[in-house]
Structures are given as structure tokens and as C-alpha cells.
A protein has these predicted regions:
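Short beta-strand or tight-loop elements
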Residues: 30, 42-44, 351
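Active-site beta-strand-loop-beta-strand hairpin of nuclease catalytic cores
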Residues: 40, 44-57
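Short, basic/polar, glycine-containing "phosphate-handling" surface segments that engage DNA
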Residues: 95-152
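Partner-binding and oligomerization surfaces adjacent to conserved cores of proteins
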Residues: 131-442
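Acidic-basic catalytic patches of nuclease active cores, encompassing PD-(D/E)XK
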Residues: 1-37, 49-50
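Nucleic-acid nuclease catalytic cores
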Residues: 65-106
Length: 442
């Protein structure tokens, strides 16, 4: 048997052993790439996940490495650190030849398989339940100084009352109920009440909207920022992020519509950036707040970092997830939803308002696959019939871009088409779709 075949067999055997021992709460993948917060990627023979978070990365090496480890004990520690792992493991072929590294240390512990499992499960006894008032003090103390404004502090403080907080003594987790957790996340987002919004898109999108009488949302996988789906996970996951099937499933069942404030309608910069170089269309929406139910539809402005390495709201969330007292830890059960409302400061000029749809089996929605022409990624779409009153955004006007070919003809034709299809409300046939007022852009 070749060395590579033997190595592959050792990895798969160890992977299955961890999978069997750790149980259903863990996912154990092989040959998985882990991305650090700073954009570096590292390949590990085995990666262990819990709650979609990277718990540990494992490198499987031959037995001869143990001699080198004695001579150079920090071997591979920099790899674990640079990958942003909380736990790194070297396996040398025998059950008693595991070298365990944990974040904050500059050396390994030599442990057996059971010791590794106990360390990963972090089985700690849970003390007496924490009084809610004391819990409020603990959590609020984790607010970064720059973020500790009076309004945010007050909104979060009000959440700590009977009925809002659950304590799972069996697993040692404290959590909010879903309504309270939604309020918690909204308190960390920009505080704006939005009754109108607009979206820059292609002329083809307007055509399909009128032709098919359907609103279209794309899955998260087709976002223009390739780190879109992992940015927040990276930040609060201590820098280590890797995709597994469950994360892919979440991303393909979560759909997005990127909007901006209505004050940005017919804005030259927005036309250039998002309106197909001013050849596209700006759709204007009215928001039906009653349909933003925080069950299937979520609608809110996006929070942006203050610098490349600082995002205070995510820092607060990270502090909460790393908090512990008497064995108790805090769990955010709706993180998989609200994490998509946090983005890198590199995109702060967008001032994005985001509509998120999380697929709900109770609602019958048409879905299809496309090959995204811009990013060449296979992506899912979901389509909402305009005639069914379930979509929170209602188009009330459209503006054809200043650089659109045959602008006047397109305005007339789309208005006539809309009069036949009755998609955008109108008083006069030629008022629903108008030309941009910008006249000096080429």
C-alpha cells in the first residue's frame, strides 16, 4: 500500500471513530478547507463542527513526526493559530499519540483519544441557575465601550425578564425565546423605520417582473461579495470558518433582495455601481410591515464594520458566545438568520436594506435553478406571485436608467406592457414607469 493510500485510510478510519463517539450533535468532515478571518485558507485532514461552528482541525501525520515534535514543540501551532482555530490536534497513528493545542497556549498536551473527546465535548458541570437581573448585568457588561450607547443598552436590558429567557440545565445553555432574540439583534442594527425602499437592477429584471407577474429572490450563494455568507461567522467564530453540507443547505434555503433607502432613487453613484452602468432600472417599493413576520420574512438595514478589523456589534456577539459562568453559556438560536445583516466595512457605502426570506414549508413557493451569468455560480431562485398578498414589498414605480439604449421607447413600451399586465399601480398609463431625470451622464 502506498503512503498516500495509507494516509487516506488512516484519515477515514479516524473520522468515522470521531463521528461515532461524538454523536449526532457533531459533524466530522475530511479534507476540509478552513478560512481565517483575514482571508487565509488552510487544509485540514479532519474538521469537526458543532452548531455549524468549527470546533477543531486535525492533521494526521506519520509516527516519525513525534521525534520532530520533541525537538521543535511549536511545530504546526502557527498553522492552528493562523487558521483561527480554538482547538488544533495532531494525530500520529496511535490512540495515545494525540497532541492537543488550545487557543492561548504555545505548547501541546499529549492526550489519548478519550482525552480528546472530553476536551471537545467540554463537559462541565452546570451550577445553580443565574438570577435574571444578575444575568442582565453580566451580558450588558460585555458591550464594547464604543457601542455602549444609552438606547442600545436600554433595549437589551428590557429583554431580561421572566418568559424571555430560557435555561437548559441539561446542556448548560441560556437563550432568549425567538421574539426576544429578534429584538436583541434588531437593537444592534441601524435604527431606522423604513416605509419605502428602492432597488437597482437590470432592465431584464423589470421585463420578467411585468411578464411573469412574480417577485424574484436569489439564494445567498449568488451575492457579489464572495465572503458574503461567511463574514459574520468568521468574526464570531474566532476566525475559523468552513463550509459543510448543513451550511450549504442553509444558504440555499435563504433568499435575499438587496435594497437601499428610497432617498437613493435616481442616484448617479447607485446607477453606476448597481444599475448596470445606468442602463438598468430602479424599482421603488412600499413596505408592508404586517408581512414582515420575522418567521419567513426579515427586513432591516445592514450593520457595517467600522474598519477592516473592527465590527463592534459582532464583537459584542462574540463576547456573549464566549461568556461562561458556573458552566453556563449563552446560545443565540437565530444567529443563522440574523448573521446575514452584518457586512464588512468595505461595503459601507451601499447603506443596504436587506429583505431575507427563509424557506418555510408551510408556504408554497415556486423555486428554480439558474446559472448566475455574473458570477458563474449555480444558484436557486424563489418566485412569489404578485397576485398573492404574501410578499412584503410592493412596486409602486420604476425609473429607467439615464444611459439606457432607446430610453424613451423603453419607457413607452414598458408602460404599455404594465397597462396590460397590471403589475405596477397607475392613474395614467404612462406614469408608472418613468425616465431618469439625470441628463448629463454618458
Amino acid at each position: 500500500m502506498t503512503y498516500l493510500a495509507s494516509q487516506k485510510e488512516s484519515v477515514e478510519k479516524l473520522r468515522k471513530k470521531f463521528l461515532k463517539t461524538l454523536g449526532d450533535n457533531y459533524i466530522v468532515g475530511s479534507n476540509t478547507e478552513v478560512s481565517s478571518f483575514y482571508g487565509k485558507s488552510f487544509m485540514f485532514d479532519i474538521v469537526i463542527f458543532k452548531n455549524n461552528e468549527v470546533v477543531a482541525g486535525i492533521l494526521v501525520k506519520n509516527f516519525c513526526l513525534s521525534v520532530r515534535l520533541i525537538c521543535k514543540p511549536d511545530q504546526y501551532i502557527n498553522v492552528f493559530k493562523d487558521a483561527g482555530l480554538r482547538c488544533g490536534i495532531l494525530y500520529l497513528g496511535k490512540d495515545d499519540e494525540f497532541y492537543l493545542w488550545t487557543d492561548g497556549n504555545w505548547s501541546y498536551q499529549n492526550v489519548d483519544f478519550d482525552g480528546i473527546v472530553n476536551s471537545l465535548k467540554d463537559n462541565r458541570p452546570v451550577g445553580e441557575p443565574i438570577l435574571i437581573d444578575d444575568l442582565a448585568v453580566e451580558i450588558l457588561s460585555l458591550l464594547p465601550d464604543k457601542l455602549d450607547d444609552v438606547e442600545c443598552h436600554h433595549k437589551i436590558e428590557l429583554l431580561f425578564k421572566e418568559g424571555n429567557v430560557n435555561m437548559d440545565k441539561l446542556n448548560g445553555y441560556i437563550s432568549f425565546n425567538s421574539v426576544a432574540e429578534d429584538i436583541f439583534f434588531k437593537a444592534l442594527l441601524p435604527q431606522k423605520r423604513i416605509s419605502k425602499a428602492c432597488r437597482y437592477t437590470s432592465l431584464q429584471s423589470l421585463f420578467l417582473l411585468l411578464k411573469d407577474k412574480k417577485h424574484c429572490m436569489c439564494s445567498l450563494t449568488c451575492m457579489n461579495d464572495k465572503g458574503e455568507t461567511s463574514y459574520a461567522d468568521n468574526y464570531v467564530g474566532n476566525g475559523a470558518y468552513a463550509e459543510n453540507y448543513q451550511i450549504l443547505e442553509e444558504n440555499n434555503n435563504c433568499y435575499i433582495l438587496s435594497c437601499c433607502a428610497d432617498s437613493k432613487q435616481d442616484d448617479l453613484t447607485m446607477w453606476r455601481l448597481y444599475g448596470c452602468d445606468a442602463k438598468g432600472v430602479c424599482l421603488r417599493y412600499k413596505v408592508n410591515e404586517k408581512l414582515v413576520d420575522n418567521k419567513s420574512f426579515f427586513f432591516a438595514p445592514v450593520s457595517y464594520g467600522s474598519s477592516e478589523k473592527e465590527h463592534l456589534e459582532l464583537e459584542f456577539i462574540n463576547n456573549i458566545l464566549n461568556w461562561t459562568k458556573n458552566g453556563w453559556r449563552f446560545k443565540l438560536n437565530r444567529w443563522h438568520i440574523w448573521k446575514h445583516f452584518f457586512k464588512s466595512y468595505l461595503f459601507k457605502d451601499e447603506n443596504e436594506i436587506r429583505l431575507l426570506y427563509v424557506h418555510n414549508n408551510d408556504i408554497e413557493i415556486e423555486k428554480c435553478w439558474i446559472m448566475d451569468s455574473k458570477n458563474s455560480i449555480a444558484s436557486r431562485l424563489c418566485l412569489f406571485d404578485i397576485d398573492k398578498d404574501i410578499f412584503p414589498l410592493k412596486v409602486y414605480s420604476a425609473i429607467i436608467g439615464p444611459n439606457c439604449n432607446q430610453q424613451a421607447s423603453n419607457v413607452a413600451q414598458f408602460n404599455y406592457m404594465n397597462m396590460q399586465q397590471k403589475v405596477i399601480p397607475f392613474n395614467r398609463w404612462n406614469e408608472a414607469i418613468v425616465a431618469s431625470k439625470i441628463r448629463d451622464y454618458r
